[in-house]
A protein has these predicted regions:
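Short, positively charged and aromatic/hydrophobic N-terminal segments
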Residues: 16-18
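Active-site beta->alpha N-cap acidic-glycine motif
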Residues: 21-101
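The substrate-binding groove and active-site-proximal loops of carbohydrate-active enzymes
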Residues: 48-56, 80-81, 108-120, 145-148, ...
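C-terminal domain-boundary segment and adjacent tail
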Residues: 21, 71-72, 223-312
Length: 312
């Protein structure tokens, strides 16, 4: 029987994750689990105090994604807000029961650029605890809202290590206003930080005329030609290196309420909502996907081999 959110209308514990083992040619399908009213483009129209009174729409989108992933025998990593874990626990339980990885997206969807070290620590600690208490499994991954770990905020990696995370997936190897980490390697890699080792899974990019182009999904899936996304993942497959794709539940929900925001933010948030599901279907048909956590042993072994070779 297919797993749906409705099966988990009351919180339950003891649902272990069952990540699928992958080889180096499988890519990473990731979902940033948040409500439509929690995103940056709409924050001028909705305050945090309004969240609880807004109609929730995340469950239907999660059901659609779970069905699609199951049909393509794909496993995914879901970066979930702590707020979702406390307000819509059945959504998180359904994801875990379907065999996908649960990871952290912070608690309040606060960008790291607006937090100091201790506020960031509190955010990643409380979100990790909320998720682990709910699904009774360890949470080892984190993604910053809006990919907001940028140059100058490298201390965030040390906090993640100190709080028990094993990997991050916040770096976009591009330069964009508000986010981007151009110096990041484009492939999964291990960082040696003062606090310890942390694996990094950057978002997928490609190059046009030697210029790095974002090609990981999300708004780029909705607004760029699909050929750009396909190119990035084909290039990664040819290199036998996994690439990271992402999507938000609200991006496959064309029926969501339209909020009064600027023309630019309307374009960013609402354009392409009606075609996103079809495009995701095409991506899943062409490429295989698994969880990020399932690749950690492979990446760790490669990093250890390189370190040993370098010391010889």
């Amino acid at each position: 029987m297919r797993t749906t959110v409705a099966q988990f209308s009351a919180p339950r514990a003891g649902l272990p994750l069952q990540p699928m083992h992958s080889n180096t040619t499988s890519h990473f399908f990731t979902v940033d689990v948040e409500e439509y009213f929690q995103v940056k483009a709409l924050e001028s129209a909705v305050t945090r105090e309004d969240w609880a009174s807004r109609p929730s729409r995340v469950a239907a989108s999660i059901d659609a994604l779970l069905e699609m992933l199951d049909r393509h025998n794909a496993r995914a990593t879901f970066f979930v807000l702590g707020w979702i874990a406390t307000h819509r626990p059945e959504v998180v339980l359904a994801i875990a029961a379907a065999g996908h990885e649960i990871a952290s997206h912070g608690f309040w969807h606060e960008r790291v650029t607006g937090l100091d070290r201790e506020a960031f620590r509190e955010d990643v600690r409380t979100s990790k605890q909320a998720l682990e208490d709910l699904v009774a499994a360890e949470v080892v991954g984190y993604r910053a809202p809006s990919f907001s770990i940028v140059p100058g905020l490298e201390w965030a990696f040390d906090v993640l290590v100190e709080e028990g995370y094993k990997y991050d997936s916040s770096l976009f190897p591009i330069h964009r206003r508000g986010y981007g980490y151009p110096a990041s390697p484009r492939i999964p890699h291990v960082m040696q930080r003062p606090a310890g080792r942390l694996s990094e899974f950057p978002l997928a990019t490609t190059s046009l005329f030697d210029y790095p182009v974002p090609a990981a999904g999300g708004g780029y899936l909705r607004q760029f030609p699909l050929a750009i996304i396909r190119r990035a993942f084909r290039e990664a497959s040819e290199r036998c290196e996994p690439a990271t794709f992402y999507i938000h539940p609200w991006e496959i929900d064309p029926g969501q309420p339209r909020l009064p925001v600027s023309a630019l933010n309307r374009l960013r948030h609402y354009r392409g909502l009606g075609s996103a599901m079809e495009r995701i279907e095409l991506i899943l048909q062409e490429f295989s996907f698994t969880t990020i956590a399932s690749y950690l042993p492979v990446l760790d072994a490669r990093a250890t081999t390189r370190t040993t070779a370098g010391a010889a």
